Amino acid sequence: AFGKYKKDLLPKLFSLFSHNLHKGIPKSMVDAMGLDRYKPADIAFNAQIILENKLEGLFNKALEISDNVVYGGGVALNCVANSKLHEQCKGNLWIFPNPGDAGGSLGAAALAYGKKVNWEHPYLGFNIEPSKPIKALAKEIVIHIKKYGMCGVAVGPAEFGPRALGNRSLLADPRGAKAQDQVNTIKRRQKFRPFAPAVFEEDVNLHFKPGYISPYMQMVVDCTDPNLPAITHKDGTSRIQTVSKNEPTIFRAILEEWKKRTGCSVLLNTSLNIRGEPMVNNISDADRFEEKYGVKVFY
């Protein structure tokens, strides 16, 4: 969103794809290609163009075989590319919630098991039993967000994957820029990085471009609601999480209580951790997070 297309940069970046870049680009190559003359944002923008072009070609081949595509790998966390692939597949695209190397462990286990596994949800981690009935706890959480702007939630089994989907989340009011600044400060993130909105599946069209169901935060869509600055990126998009009526966690109850008290069916949702640290897993982690960062964590 911050970079620009550079016609002379594309072939230079394309030539790098024949090298192993896991450890970065060697300085000798940077110097030889004059890459240090370009802004990092421009390099990222043009690398994204190459990635999307390559993926489009691969998907064209896959769609010759089937109308349905299952897509994995760490690159499947690239939400901008995913949205374009979703359109290319006319919506018939499924991405595992943990598509990177770590998610392969579950696939290996399923293969060893040797039987069909019915995928229900990604809540497979350590379980924190709620301290009180779900509706009562959801009410406390929403009252706290209304008063202080944000809070943490650590209830139920942890998510299996890199996205916090409501069980290990830091939630905030998305209707003002103040909340975005507060959360960025706590999480020690760069100011330009956007946060994700969680929204009722049935209310997506009220706030975002219609046609996208994304329960695992895997795609970006145009935000059409000007009253949600905290979850809208510079390019006008949002990485949405859609929450269905069948959501098996406390998160649906929290959103319902939030809408009842504010009229808004969207919450800012980000992972309950600090940059460089793992997500909160158990009650001890939750207590430590609350004490260290001064953010109330409900469980």
Predicted segments — roles?
Residues I65-G74, G152:
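Short glycine-rich phosphate-binding loop at a beta-alpha junction
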Residues F45-V69:
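Phosphate/ATP-binding catalytic cores across multiple sugar-kinase/actin-like superfamilies
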Residues P40-I43, A47, L51, G73, ...:
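Secondary-structure capping and boundary motifs in well-ordered enzyme cores
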Residues A1-K27, L77-N78, N82-Y299:
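Flexible beta->alpha loop and helix N-cap segments adjacent to enzyme active/binding sites
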Residues M29-N46, H233-R239:
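Gly-rich Lys/Arg/Thr-decorated short loops/hinges at beta-loop-alpha junctions or inter-strand turns
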